[in-house]
């Protein structure tokens, strides 16, 4: 099973916080920063899955998974645009959905 180093976990958390800072603004930015700061100690080390056979089921796997999903979502959107698809959502909406697709 893949394992992340402490540095990778910290780097991933910092990338996630930078993504939030660069994507959102206003009240949404403030609320997201408040939520993620409050849960940092748990979210930064949480696995993406509790089952060892599933994706990113290691310490720090949740944040790594979220970063992969947001990156893939943006790449797929770009492919759709290049194919002439009508895009009726913003990058902010796409990233918000990608970041939180596993919550709740």
Positions of PLM-derived features:
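Acidic/His-rich, divalent-metal-binding segments that scaffold phosphate/diphosphate chemistry
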Residues: 1-104
